[in-house]
């Protein structure tokens, strides 16, 4: 059967039309910013917008749905950024075709319709398709083999291959408990000329068999004990990657050869002047324009925090690849028009936002190009002279001063076969982050010349307020209005937004007035009673005097107050566990985590950390009510409340009682300790002499952290073919095996070197009564070189010897001089003479010295020069 060529637009329309004809409601793609899952950075699958339906907390007016969902994988757990441009199928942005049944049809219809669409509509050759099913799912197996007619040898049963019951590539779980069920994946066979084996085989990671469609059958509910019971209304969730399907239907092997990427790559070629359409940098640019444009359309502008920072990383990665192609001026934003022409029909919001997207990307380009060339020069200089690892402090300087995200520097190093000291980068980041953050905010806010009245803060009681704009600042200057796309600061007469203070981050949210929407990314104090709402006007126009609906982001506020209240409980627990000397030295509380610095002169033990966690979680389980009372300072002192570091107190203060903790605090907090949900310490470290730092997470973030750890343990256990409870013993066994093998290898190297040493004696040349030998030893390490050197010195008696070995591009050199000859020849001088010719240096004693080098290509010539050098010394 000849497969017809479908364009990407054809594939989308055909898919939606097919399922619409089967009674499905066509649902538009949701935003890349999930509206119902604060733990998820970006929408990464079609089912995200239906998650609440599957969980039973939402009900739609339809029971069958189909969509083409815009997805992004470039941050958090799901992150493909570093692979984009280097492989045939990795993308930041991609489209997911899907169909869903909410308690309506089930396996039979789902699989039969999938087969019908693939073979009868898209005309894929049936003999090229195979399927997998969960090993125990006889129903799906029978549908494939007995009803659809797929030969049994092309239906593969996959069991629990992930280290536990129901832990399988073919058993899907939304979480550790809740809806779950088997799945059936459809694969396309590219043919035996492509390396790789079928799913479930040792070679399954090859490119021959490519998964194109996954049908998930949610038919069970998983309890905490791991048991499953049937759901009263089973559901279907399917997903098929549009780009992968397009590559098959368009008879190409790489996603970057399909029509939409072909057009974008040609547009990138036009703007950069790069004629080689297969250049990886053009692929990177073509991929990244899709991701960045859709993110701007969905309200994510480049920034230094959260989703905005992921956006900035993607934009700057694309710009750097343009620079690599010789483009030294802004070009990336010019591709928006091409993208809108290609995808605007399918995503009308993209076409409508094209002008705004262009302006946002152009502004970011202009900002980065100001420092890009200087930064690249610094990076090039740091990587000169045979350096194999970019120092962490250099990577941080590039990040902090020149706006180079770490992965951009890593990308440059990767192209040159080098790496980045990421641990060193993190150390430098931690040392300067708080100071840089404080300095930046001080400059920003002090630049605002505000002399008006203060505002009323209502955020303890309300998260939404009708307010009046009393001042606007654009680029640090007072303005009468803000227009769409402008960054600015807005001051309100009344606000529910909490301004950063006492270590708690400022609120995020939005200000709405008619069609105007101002996205608040941070709230900072201009003066003690004047709050500046920092952000970007996404739509419309705002003027001084306008009334707005000020709406705090409820999810971010809730996560922040959980962390803040937990910080108070943790402070009390630390004093109980470590001693009364524990005093707060600083803190940072935001929606992601709490970071708490305190006086203590030794690292916390594991037992102490566990005890603090236990005490805090006990307070959470007690579900005690919190109480905040305003009183004068004298009355507050009588209550015994602790005063917090970094907080300036007035005549009237706020005493917060939460659990057994009592402190002065003006921040926002939970109503009851149980609202915190869960508390987990994730890091403990030293930040200065006598100061320790604890980082912790709460609520959903704590759950996500524990689930990630559990996943890591399960994955490691699966790799080592052990249960999680057996993992520690199994690791010990593997380490013992490694040690035994290392001893065996060392012994074999010694035998090999010894045998080579006997042969090398015959190569020694007599120079004025001194035996001179310069030779290579194959497969030797530094230890073997030294041992062989000692044996040769014993046998040759009066001698000068140089031995060298090569491991990849690295060179190890040993120079030895017998004790009766060190007055004439020094081993240290000799080893440096040889090492200097292979890009290295070394040192040692008069009779033995070692060196390393990086240029193995010149080693033979260096060894040949030894005889002349020794002769000149005699």
UniProtKB/Swiss-Prot annotation:
It comes from the Bacteria. Belongs to the class-II aminoacyl-tRNA synthetase family. Its EC number is 6.1.1.7. Pfam families: DHHA1, tRNA-synt_2c, tRNA_SAD. GO terms for cellular component: cytosol. Consists of three domains; the N-terminal catalytic domain, the editing domain and the C-terminal C-Ala domain. The editing domain removes incorrectly charged amino acids, while the C-Ala domain, along with tRNA(Ala), serves as a bridge to cooperatively bring together the editing and aminoacylation centers thus stimulating deacylation of misacylated tRNAs. The keyword Ligase applies. One of its GO terms (molecular function) is aminoacyl-tRNA deacylase activity. The keyword RNA-binding applies. GO terms for biological process: alanyl-tRNA aminoacylation; negative regulation of DNA-templated transcription. This is Alanine--tRNA ligase. It is an enzyme of class 6 (ligase). Keywords: Aminoacyl-tRNA synthetase, ATP-binding, Cytoplasm, Ligase, Metal-binding, Nucleotide-binding, Protein biosynthesis, RNA-binding, tRNA-binding, Zinc. InterPro entries: aa-tRNA-synth_II/BPL/LPL, Ala-tRNA-lgiase_IIc, Ala-tRNA-ligase_IIc_anticod-bd, Ala-tRNA-synth_IIc_core, Ala-tRNA-synth_IIc_N, Ala-tRNA_ligase, Ala_tRNA_ligase_euk/bac, DHHA1_dom. Catalyzes the attachment of alanine to tRNA(Ala) in a two-step reaction: alanine is first activated by ATP to form Ala-AMP and then transferred to the acceptor end of tRNA(Ala). Also edits incorrectly charged Ser-tRNA(Ala) and Gly-tRNA(Ala) via its editing domain. Binds 1 zinc ion per subunit. Its main location: cytoplasm. It catalyses: tRNA(Ala) + L-alanine + ATP = L-alanyl-tRNA(Ala) + AMP + diphosphate. SUPFAM superfamilies: Class II aaRS and biotin synthetases (SSF55681), Putative anticodon-binding domain of alanyl-tRNA synthetase (AlaRS) (SSF101353), ThrRS/AlaRS common domain (SSF55186), Translation proteins (SSF50447). NCBIfam families: alaS. Zn(2+) binds at residues 564, 568, 665, 669. It is found in: Cytoplasm. Its cofactor is Zn(2+).
